[in-house]
Amino acid sequence: MEFESVFKMHYPYLAAVIYDDSSTLKDFHPSLTDDFSCVHNVHHKPSMPHTYEIPSKETIRGITPSPCTEAFEACFHGTSNDHVFFGMAYTTPPTIEPNVSHVSHDNTMWENDQNQGFIFGTESTLNQAMADSNQFNMPKPLLSANEDTIMNRRQNNQVMIKTEQIKKKNKRFQMRRICKPTKKASIIKGQWTPEEDKLLVQLVDLHGTKKWSQIAKMLQGRVGKQCRERWHNHLRPDIKKDGWTEEEDIILIKAHKEIGNRWAEIARKLPGRTENTIKNHWNATKRRQHSRRTKGKDEISLSLGSNTLQNYIRSVTYNDDPFMTANANANIGPRNMRGKGKNVMVAVSEYDEGECKYIVDGVNNLGLEDGRIKMPSLAAMSASGSASTSGSASGSGSGVTMEIDEPMTDSWMVMHGCDEVMMNEIALLEMIAHGRL
């Protein structure tokens, strides 16, 4: 009811048509009178009705252009006494739409004799309200030619975009497969035969030392890198294949102190020695030293039978040796003392490689005078340890085996900070003093 009252207040003429009640215009507004009407009785047809051609599928119900005196009424109802304006508003040329059968209809404004009047030109609210009562069968909206063309273009563009994406994806996959380097069918990775070496020398004389890929094409199963390395490391005429001299070892040591393990740069300072040769010589010397150490030989015997390069490698790789690093970095740690006295676990102090204090102390205790070693007598040693326990000494044919009481051994080693290597050296000095070596 509120909607009806508001609608009658704002649209009195439409309310008179829709609701068709007997209320007068004065009921809606005092200024309105019944002297004129914009809606005439449709049963009374004029003698000369105006006919307009409008293309449509449905019959258009019309009303007579009413003699409205106010300007807003003519614009509101879409009617006017001006025939030119009325024709411009409601006469539309027939258009042919694609995919739609064109049927022209000549309908007059007075074709329907029903009491209900249709006010041509009104939209939205009125037509939606009347559509529920099925009084008018409104046609479904159809796309115009331009809209249909635009939709088709959008669909075609989407299809083209998807097609281009698929093409790009396939192209990237194909390029990835094409750019992937193809492996040689059968690459020989074994040793070079004398026939291959001879052929390689001939090809290098013919093509030089720059065109290795071209040379590799003439050697079945070989690539350019293999040919280059074989030539520079083995087949080059100026390569030295004899043993290493002391002078070359000194040059190698000096260069290694300056630039480290840069074998290619070191090879420039050693004519006739290739990068591979220098590296192999270094590693072979290092392996020999390690194998001799693992066999149980002490540092004294290693130093007596080693050359300059071995001594340098031992000094460089001292911190890399796990056993020696553990001895050097341990501040206090247990050591199993063998060769002197009983097997006793004692705590030893840190051992410094560059410090020879233990040798000096040992020599002073042994009484080195005028190049002659004076060993303390066994009686004095046993007397010093008689306060606690007794001691004994025994000798064998090949060497001297001494067994001293634990208090004497522990106190002497702790005082001088000896470890297993030190004790072996002291035992060696004792054997020299007794003339056993």
UniProtKB/Swiss-Prot annotation:
Membrane-spanning parts: none
Family matches, as SMART domains: SANT
Known tissue expression: Mainly expressed in siliques. Also detected at low levels in leaves and flowers.
Induction of expression: Induced by LEC2.
Protein name listed in UniProt: Transcription factor MYB118
GO biological process, one term: positive regulation of unsaturated fatty acid biosynthetic process
UniProt note: phenotype after gene disruption: Single and myb118 myb115 double mutants do not show apparent developmental abnormalities. Reduced omega-7 fatty acids accumulation in the endosperm. The endosperm oil of double mutant myb115 myb118 lacks omega-7 fatty acids. Endosperm-specific derepression of maturation-related genes associated with a partial relocation of storage compounds from the embryo to the endosperm.
Single annotated GO MF: sequence-specific DNA binding
GO cellular component: nucleus
Highest taxon of the lineage: Eukaryota
Motif (Nuclear localization signal): 152-159
Annotated region of DNA binding: 212-235, 263-286
Assigned keywords, A-Z: Activator, DNA-binding, Nucleus, Repeat, Transcription, Transcription regulation
One Pfam family linked to the record: Myb_DNA-bind_6
Compartments (UniProt record): Nucleus
Residue span(s) of domain HTH myb-type: 184-239, 240-290
Physiological role: Transcription activator that recognizes the motif 5'-TAACGG-3' in the promoter of endosperm-induced genes. Promotes vegetative-to-embryonic transition and the formation of somatic embryos from root explants in a WUS-independent manner but via the expression of embryonic genes (e.g. LEC1, LEC2, FUS3 and WUS). May play an important role during embryogenesis and seed maturation. Together with MYB115, activates the transcription of S-ACP-DES2/AAD2 and S-ACP-DES3/AAD3 thus promoting the biosynthesis of omega-7 monounsaturated fatty acid in seed endosperm.
Keyword Disulfide bond: no
PROSITE patterns, alphabetized: HTH_MYB (PS51294)
Keyword Endoplasmic reticulum in record: no
